[in-house]
């Protein structure tokens, strides 16, 4: 590994400086970004030297790890959060095969039944904004508790009701309850995982939202074929109830405002069963007093009223918008292919309902493989860039990314796989106009699912990287765009195919994706520079505010 400091430029050594022969890691995040920005001004001679000096590690408070949880515990926590987020897409798509039966049973038109789908999608995009803001302040466990209480109650009502008005209202509540868990999942990852390890964990956190649209039509088709449509909601009630019991007994509070790196004792409403048992064993008043003092500032914020408009501050950052829109379009393309697949295979291959449901299985497998493979690619590229710059990556330590090209490290993986997905989308569309073996389109569906899921996951990682500690808030915004763009592209694919044919309709979908992702080339090239300029402006603004405050005090 190359020596990170240039010996021709002497650097001031703090009292606790490391020996010269030690390798240098990414700057510890406990040193605020403004210090890095100010140090750039002190040594403007060389950009490489400037970066190296800012990458010098600093001692964190008490030298504590970023998270006290073990690697296996973190994997279980992320898996549990991912399963919690699985219920929203599961509930959305499992409903589709039963629409004709519901239309007949309630004696309503297809347009009226489709309105329940639209209502679900609208709430699926809006509800996480409230949940994300609440969980960032009150904690992840209270956020999950509210989500599942609403979701379980809605499922029970849907299983018992027989009126259109009740169906409309309860589907909206079902959407509001289940969709909030998606945003909290990435918040959990942001709480316990450092950027250098985040790739694989974010992928696992996204697997629920990827598998849901692919697997749920199969389950819904089986219920619609062999049972009464009410059993769809009984199944969701039983499944979610069985999940909630172990989840709320053992899932720990992770919000850093509440428990820090996991060492702090959470308030009563944030405790799981091990926390309660541990609290009972703490008999020494001094230890309890120290824990209360340590968490006083964190607990003070837990009762703040959630502000759903707070998430829109993300849109004030142009670089973030340039990342958000491609993420939404990627999932929109996925939903467009998913929505059009049933009609295409019925028209071309005359598949029955069960066979049509089975074609979603390869897409689910593609999404699952994406979750298992994408994270490793993302982490590998992160470490490759670190080695290239002579940077030592510290495990389980949060490290400053101000002078690290995190955009390039992430997008070098994201852009090629998305291009592969767009090529497969075009090929799929034109194959459906030809009399070819069914295995060809199915293989392309598998590759498209892998590609779009991988691209979406990597952009999720990048967004969480650029908003540390606010993963739930960023994910809520991504979810909003994903749902609204997905609803639009899913609604567009059928009339577009009728007007232009399968070949040109999917070609247009691919071209929309290419156009939406082209700004990411600028992000990859200038992203680090933009972040540094933003940090410098923030430091300058902070200095002016401090000076103004000092003048007022005088």
Swiss-Prot record:
| Keyword Translocase belongs to the record | no
Instruction: Give the positions annotated as glycosylation sites.
Output: 6, 107, 114, 437
- Gene (name only): tstD
* Role summary: MFS-type transporter; part of the gene cluster that mediates the biosynthesis of the antihypercholesterolemic agents phomoidrides which are dimeric anhydrides.
How does this chain sit within the bilayer? Answer: Multi-pass membrane protein
In which compartments does the protein localize? Membrane
Say how it is used: Phomoidrides A and B (also known as CP-225,917 and CP-263,114) are potent inhibitors of Ras farnesyltransferase and squalene synthase. CP-225,917 and CP-263,114 inhibit Ras farnesyl transferase from rat brain with IC(50) values of 6 uM and 20 uoM, respectively. CP-225,917 inhibits squalene synthase with an IC(50) value of 43 uM and CP-263,114 with an IC(50) of 160 uM.
| GO CC terms in record | plasma membrane
What is the recorded name of this protein? MFS-type transporter tstD
Quick check: keyword Metal-binding in the entry? Answer: no
One Pfam family assigned to this protein is: MFS_1
Q: What is its main location?
A: membrane
Q: List the disulfide bonds.
A: none
Q: Where is the composition biased (Polar residues)?
A: 1-10, 27-38
């Amino acid at each position: 590994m190359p020596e990170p400091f240039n010996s021709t430029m002497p650097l001031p050594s703090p009292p606790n400086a490391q020996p010269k022969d030690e390798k240098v890691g990414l700057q510890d995040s406990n040193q605020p970004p403004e210090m890095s920005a100010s140090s750039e001004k002190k040594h403007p001679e060389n950009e490489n030297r400037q970066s190296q000096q800012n990458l010098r590690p600093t001692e964190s408070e008490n030298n504590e790890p970023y998270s006290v949880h073990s690697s296996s515990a973190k994997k279980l926590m992320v898996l549990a959060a991912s399963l919690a987020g699985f219920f929203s897409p599961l509930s959305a798509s499992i409903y589709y095969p039963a629409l004709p039966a519901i239309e007949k049973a309630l004696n309503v038109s297809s347009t009226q039944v489709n309105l329940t789908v639209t209502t679900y999608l609208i709430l699926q995009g809006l509800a996480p904004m409230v949940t994300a803001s609440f969980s960032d302040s009150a904690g992840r466990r209270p956020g999950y508790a509210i989500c599942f209480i609403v979701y379980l109650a809605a499922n029970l009502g849907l299983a018992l009701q027989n009126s259109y008005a009740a169906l409309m209202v309860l589907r909206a509540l079902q959407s509001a309850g289940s969709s909030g868990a998606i945003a909290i999942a990435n918040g959990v990852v942001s709480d316990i995982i450092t950027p250098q390890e985040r790739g694989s964990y974010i992928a696992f956190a996204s697997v629920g939202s990827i598998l849901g649209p692919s697997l749920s039509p199969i389950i819904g088709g089986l219920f619609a074929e062999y049972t009464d449509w009410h059993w769809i909601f009984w199944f969701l009630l039983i499944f979610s109830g069985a999940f909630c019991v172990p989840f709320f007994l053992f899932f720990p509070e992770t919000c850093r405002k509440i428990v820090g790196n996991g060492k702090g004792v959470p308030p009563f409403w944030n405790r799981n069963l091990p926390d309660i048992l541990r609290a009972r064993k703490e008999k020494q008043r001094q230890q309890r007093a120290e824990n209360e003092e340590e968490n006083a500032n964190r607990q003070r914020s837990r009762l703040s009223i959630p502000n759903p408009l707070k998430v829109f501050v993300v849109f004030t950052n142009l670089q973030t918008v340039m990342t958000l829109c491609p993420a939404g379009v990627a999932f929109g393309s996925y939903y467009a292919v998913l929505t059009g697949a049933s009609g295409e295979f019925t028209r071309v291959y005359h598949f029955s309902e069960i066979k049509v449901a089975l074609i979603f299985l390869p897409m689910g497998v593609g999404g699952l493989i994406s979750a298992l493979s994408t994270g490793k690619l993302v982490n590998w590229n992160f470490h490759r860039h670190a080695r290239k710059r002579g940077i030592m990556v510290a495990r389980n330590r949060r490290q400053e990314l101000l002078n690290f090209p995190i955009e390039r490290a992430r997008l070098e993986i994201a852009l090629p796989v998305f291009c592969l997905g767009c090529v497969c989308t075009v090929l799929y569309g034109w194959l459906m106009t030809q009399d070819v073996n069914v295995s060809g389109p199915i293989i392309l569906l598998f590759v498209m699912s892998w590609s779009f899921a991988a691209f979406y996951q990597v952009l999720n990682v990048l967004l969480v990287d650029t908003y540390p500690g606010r993963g739930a808030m960023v994910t809520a915004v991504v979810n909003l765009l994903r749902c609204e763009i997905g609803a639009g592209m899913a609604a567009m694919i059928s009339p577009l195919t009728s007007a232009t044919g399968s070949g040109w309709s999917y070609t247009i979908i691919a071209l929309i994706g290419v156009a939406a992702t082209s700004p990411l080339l600028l992000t990859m090239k200038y992203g680090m520079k933009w972040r540094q300029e933003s940090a410098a402006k923030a430091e300058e603004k902070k200095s002016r505010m401090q000076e103004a405050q000092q003048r007022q005090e005088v």
